[in-house]
Curated annotation (Swiss-Prot):
Pathway: Amino-acid biosynthesis; L-leucine biosynthesis; L-leucine from 3-methyl-2-oxobutanoate: step 2/4. Keywords: 4Fe-4S, Amino-acid biosynthesis, Branched-chain amino acid biosynthesis, Iron, Iron-sulfur, Leucine biosynthesis, Lyase, Metal-binding. Its EC number is 4.2.1.33. InterPro entries: 3-IsopropMal_deHydase_lsu, Acnase/IPM_dHydase_lsu_aba_1/3, Acoase/IPM_deHydtase_lsu_aba, Aconitase_4Fe-4S_BS, Aconitase_4Fe-4S_dom, IPM_dehydratase_rel_enz, IPMI_cat. One of its GO terms (biological process) is L-leucine biosynthetic process. [4Fe-4S] cluster binds at C347, C407, C410. It is an enzyme of class 4 (lyase). This is 3-isopropylmalate dehydratase large subunit. Catalyzes the isomerization between 2-isopropylmalate and 3-isopropylmalate, via the formation of 2-isopropylmaleate. It comes from Escherichia coli O127:H6 (strain E2348/69 / EPEC). It comes from the Bacteria. One of its GO terms (molecular function) is 3-isopropylmalate dehydratase activity. NCBIfam families: leuC, PRK05478.1, PRK12466.1. Belongs to the aconitase/IPM isomerase family. LeuC type 1 subfamily.
Amino acid sequence: MAKTLYEKLFDAHVVYEAENETPLLYIDRHLVHEVTSPQAFDGLRAHGRPVRQPGKTFATMDHNVSTQTKDINACGEMARIQMQELIKNCKEFGVELYDLNHPYQGIVHVMGPEQGVTLPGMTIVCGDSHTATHGAFGALAFGIGTSEVEHVLATQTLKQGRAKTMKIEVQGKAAPGITAKDIVLAIIGKTGSAGGTGHVVEFCGEAIRDLSMEGRMTLCNMAIEMGAKAGLVAPDETTFNYVKGRLHAPKGKDFDDAVAYWKTLQTDEGATFDTVVTLQAEEMSPQVTWGTNPGQVISVNDNIPDPASFADPVERASAEKALAYMGLKPGIPLTEVAIDKVFIGSCTNSRIEDLRAAAEIAKGRKVAPGVQALVVPGSGPVKAQAEAEGLDKIFIEAGFEWRLPGCSMCLAMNNDRLNPGERCASTSNRNFEGRQGRGGRTHLVSPAMAAAAAVTGHFADIRNIK
């Protein structure tokens, strides 16, 4: 029987499946951070259980860390306790930890792929909703809760029901300046923020194949923002070339054997999906969210929509509430909306290609008066690479702040946050009320669009910036 990629990955990992019971899946990789793991380790300790497979478990610090100092005390008592607990737990249970002073420390979903921890064909879990990022490699990756974190630590397995399947095909080639972030925001604009609920999404089509691995990670990172369980891109030569030579990747003949298997990780011809969505890449333009969920998104050259234009009463009410929170009026051009802060970073857009795209816009320009702009590399290696290329100097000269790696202003769990009423052009993945700080107003954009907003002081079409 013809199978989808998701079905192949799922079936290959079923350990046990009794009739009328949820299947038990084997987990190949477990990524751990300081926020969702303390109670899980406490649970192990209380029952006298070890971590079953320490060699398949990797930990880092990212959510709570300061991006201005390596001092563990910098972000307050709760953050300090969580980080100290992670150090203690990893030492006690034999788990590899990339702590604040480790050169590989960074956002968990940047670190995993970078170190070759993430490989095609794997099941990967983490106590973090954006674990879907790793699906870019043709891995089945999804976020789990703290009780599930404990279960995986103890057993290296997890009970998981089968999801429905969705195919999102982006046909044709994207125009210059249109990034993976624009593509995924356009997709969510079409499906809505709940359009993928109950599904695992496979992204395909020429525009997806054309993306680098970093672009594919951006894409899969935001699968969760359309309500999907996970996002997938089938592995190909782009994938294999990215993985080759990385720290934890197979070497020599083992790598060749792995590639031979990875090449089978494609949806079979004739396999059926529960839902199919098709978009045309050439119709896409730079995207900016205007509301309080990622599905409330328009082209940078559009006007703020009028809630009255929505036929669905629920959508209309949601739009009215969003505009009130965002302090926006219907009908005004998006390019006239001024911003206070810019955040370039997060597990969506903090990799080297993202920083290069932002630096290209920043070069030779200055951050607009009254705007604070942060650039936060996703990991130690990304920061080192950017500095080797001189990107830090470009940003600093333009008036951006060049920070240490961490989750930073994506979420209000550290010192980087918005004040009430402040408006931010952000490369992160969520624009919910209060996500970047109580009363903060978040607009999601690509790195180049964020840099353009920083230097102009408002939203601007990067295609017009010469």
